[in-house]
């Protein structure tokens, strides 16, 4: 019941599966939730402009049922994205969403 979704305007990514696994492990560790409930998405080549520029940038959504620590996680995930994709931290927006368990479905039911 945790999700990280990265949309970026650059197309080529070296070893995207390795990056998705790294993000999954990092999200599980930072939320204290089992990785068996973590989903990671990477959407490349999205038309995107940030601060009036087409330079590499990313929009990141991090959703979880509780266990979010935005100030710590913002630095952690900006650094991970910078190191993995070469996108400067000041060109990354992260939106955190603490989702009500009743609004998150899985396996034909909700968590709350």
What are these regions (language model features)?
Residues 1-112:
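Interaction-mediating elements
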